[in-house]
Design a protein with these regions (language model features):
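Short helix-perturbing small/polar motifs within transmembrane alpha-helices
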Residues: 2-72, 80-229
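Membrane-proximal helical linkers
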Residues: 175-180, 231-252
């Protein structure tokens, strides 16, 4: 969902009862969203669906470690938003789940953690599902500028992804919720703004040219991935040094 669609994947150090309850709640919401998508199922969009699915899966492997947070971000968000805007709810959920599942596998070939995978998949399903419902069912569609439903859907995806991530980090690491969410907001908000801009251009061009337009987004996202990697690579040592200094100060 980035996120991820910004998408984060922290390590659950100590799974508290509260964290387990929250993960169960998010998973239940995701199951409900999937069931709802089955009830609203429409014919697949064929090549357009397959192309966005493939692009989202490839983009999911372009992961960046976030400085100061126990998590990472992939550059698959524009493809989530393209799915939200141009495909059905069921198709958007399939793309989000496949891309997020791909993101869950560590680059070093290690095994993913099942509880973490469940949480990440559930969060992505809820976020993208809500975004799709907001976009397609908004009463503002056709009344206001055509870009407003996309902005509303992106804001929904942003909140539905970042708030659960901040909550689970708060529950597992004992850090204040608003402090965690503020850090996530500062790191990921520009990426969401960029993603909604890219999606707006793609959806407009697709009406004139065709479904092939999303294919041009992957090189752009790779360039963004490289830029973020360089920027966060410089910021990460500083964040680690700050965390160590705080830990040393707390020990005295």
């Amino acid at each position: 969902m980035a996120s991820p669609m910004q998408k984060l994947g922290g390590t659950v150090k100590t799974v508290s009862h509260g964290a387990l309850v929250f993960i169960g709640f998010v998973a239940t919401c995701a199951a409900g969203m999937l069931a709802h998508s089955f009830l609203r199922m429409q014919p697949l969009h064929g090549l357009e669906f397959v192309s966005v699915l493939g692009l989202a899966v490839v983009a999911a492997r372009m992961k960046i470690k976030l400085p100061g947070l126990n998590g990472n971000m992939s550059v698959n968000l524009p493809f989530f938003l393209i799915a939200v805007a141009q495909l059905s709810l069921f198709e958007a959920l399939l793309i989000a789940l496949a891309s997020t599942l791909t993101q869950c596998f560590p680059k070093d070939g290690g095994k993913p953690k099942l509880l973490q995978m469940l949480f990440n998949l559930s969060t992505a399903a809820v976020a993208v599902g809500l975004g799709s419902l907001i976009f397609h069912d908004s009463p503002l569609r056709g009344v206001w500028s055509s870009g407003l439903p996309l902005v509303m859907a992106t804001a929904t995806v942003f909140l539905a992804q970042t708030m659960p991530v901040a909550t689970i980090i708060s529950l597992t690491e004992g850090v204040k919720l608003l402090r965690i969410w503020s850090s996530i907001f500062q790191l990921s908000f520009p990426y969401y703004v960029l993603s909604v801009g890219i999606t707006s251009i793609v959806t407009t061009a697709s009406r004139q040219v065709g479904w092939q337009i999303p294919l041009s987004v992957l090189p752009v996202m790779y360039a963004i991935y490289r830029s973020y990697r360089v920027y966060f690579g410089r910021a990460l040592p500083q964040a680690n040094d700050l965390a160590m200094a705080k830990g040393a100060g707390a020990a005295h």
